[in-house]
Every structure is written in C-alpha cells, then in structure tokens.
C-alpha cells in the first residue's frame, strides 16, 4: 500500500518537476533542468539561446510561468513558437 501511494505521488509530480525546480529566485531564473533543455528540439521558447525561440527568433517572456513567447499575437495556447511546430 505504501509503495502504491509513493508511486502515485511520483506520477503526479513528475510532469511538474520543471515548475518546481525552475523557480525564479530574486528575479533570476535558475539553470534549466534537462527536461526543459530537451524542449529545444520541439521549438519551444528557450532561455538557453539568449531568450529566443528556436528558428523564428521570437523573444521569451521571463515573467511568463511557462516561458511562452512574449509576442502574444503569435503565441499559441500551448506555448509553441508560431510556425515552427513541424519544422
């Protein structure tokens, strides 16, 4: 029973690990986790490349909770950079 509870808790928190470990401290973001770094290959706005989205050059909004593009006209609901999802 205890093992089942531990597994359930882990499964609940693993998808949110980046939100927990990538907190903003004193206005500066911590280094990104490997999970976040892995998103580069999917064209998500990434702070590792100077705050730019991969391919289209849109700027990251560091205040945004999910690191979405700050160009709100082009930012999708899923925080993909516009026009790059299938590049």
Swiss-Prot record:
Which segments are removed on maturation as propeptide? Answer: 20-42
Q: Does the keyword Signal apply?
A: yes
Q: Which GO terms describe its cellular component?
A: extracellular region
Which Gene Ontology terms cover its molecular function? ion channel inhibitor activity; toxin activity
Where does the UniProt entry say this protein principally localizes?
secreted
Tissue spec. comment: Expressed by the venom duct.
PTM (free text): Contains 4 disulfide bonds.
Q: Where is the signal peptide?
A: 1-19
| Domain-related comment | The cysteine framework is XII (C-C-C-C-CC-C-C).
What family is this? Belongs to the conotoxin O1 superfamily.
User: What is this protein identified as?
Assistant: Conotoxin Cl12.3
Organism whose genome encodes this protein: Californiconus californicus
